[in-house]
Amino acid sequence: MKKPIVCCDFDGTITKNDNIIRIMKHFAPSEWTKLKDDVLTKEITIQEGVGQMFQLLKSDQKEAIQSFILEDTEIREGFKQFVDHVKKADIPFYVLSGGMDFFVYPILEGIVEREDIYCNHASFHEEHIQIEWPHACDSQCQNGCGCCKPSIIRELTRENDFIIMIGDSVTDVEAAKHADLTFARDYLLNECKELGLVHKEYETFIDLKAQFDQIKEVKEWQTKRTSAGRS
């Protein structure tokens, strides 16, 4: 029997909008748009693009950026209930985020433990924001992911695990290639279709939960736990 493991993106997945894009639109000079486009067309890596975007912002903007994000972030419907449901089933749940710790941690406070969150670190010690990459690509990845989701998945999972990825964007494509099943929407949905990856479409965590409970490996895992509880 395979053990289900859930790996979930943050920006545009847990939250309704991409917080990095929101930050750039509100605080950054116009140069950020070319960096974004260059990432999407793969002219530069995600790590290069995101790092350079944040270098456009001054470190003394930290509090303003944090307040802007925390005051206006919308969590996708059903997320907390889904996390509680997964935890109750004793299924590991990890957040793999290309976002920054100074806004990811506060948003997920009380829902996901920090040790289960993998994201980038923003440093405010220099004039402009510098991004540090504690979860950069391992020896098996040369894509310059920044927060390398495939590398984290390799670190977290074992051969007999059933990996479920939840995502929406370009930063989730490589992770989806390593998953047994991907819940996808938006850009990632189109990529899954084009690449022939096993996937299901979702819009909220409410409909995702309904589909999640029908996955064969999840049902088998839940049945095993129920039987063990009775014995």
From Swiss-Prot:
Reaction equations catalysed: 2-hydroxy-5-methylsulfanyl-3-oxopent-1-enyl phosphate + H2O = 1,2-dihydroxy-5-(methylsulfanyl)pent-1-en-3-one + phosphate
Assigned keywords, A-Z: Amino-acid biosynthesis, Hydrolase, Methionine biosynthesis
Any single Pfam family the record assigns to this protein: HAD
GO terms assigned for molecular function: 2-hydroxy-3-keto-5-methylthiopentenyl-1-phosphate phosphatase activity; L-phosphoserine phosphatase activity; magnesium ion binding
Gene Ontology CC, one term: cytoplasm
InterPro entries, sorted: HAD-like_SerB, HAD-like_sf, HAD-SF_hydro_IB_MtnX, HAD_hydro_PyrdxlP_Pase-like, HAD_sf
HAMAP family, sorted: Salvage_MtnX
Family to which the UniProt record says this protein belongs: Belongs to the HAD-like hydrolase superfamily. MtnX family.
Name of the protein in its database record: 2-hydroxy-3-keto-5-methylthiopentenyl-1-phosphate phosphatase
Species name: Bacillus pumilus (strain SAFR-032)
Gene name per UniProt: mtnX
